[in-house]
């Protein structure tokens, strides 16, 4: 089964994806790639330009509710305080090559990746992609805040992230 129709696939841009080393543990990020669909890095998940909090600590902007489909595929969801929130993968390596950084149920960026391994299907995938906005396939849906309120759409093209944390920067604790 395909996630996208042929016309939708043609309306997705290829993206040069930089696979930098983990900014806290210097674990090699591997080769850069050109991809149509990918997952965010630590730097991207902590980028205010993308709407996220700069700190790697708890953040509402990184919380993500699992869909029924994700749960049926094995993704674990919090059943208590953060109801239906789940962990999601980042592409940055963790403290060593066997771990991958991830975001936990309360939006904390877990840069070590400890506690989950590469084959752990309890962690969900939250894909990122770039759309050709000139395509007639896509329609702007507006914005919806975390409280469910819709706002008047403001189309603003995104630019390359201008924030790249280094191990020397103080941007919060690392777990």
Task: Please give the residue ranges for each predicted region.
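Collagenous Gly-X-Y triple-helix signature in extracellular proteins
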Residues: 1-175
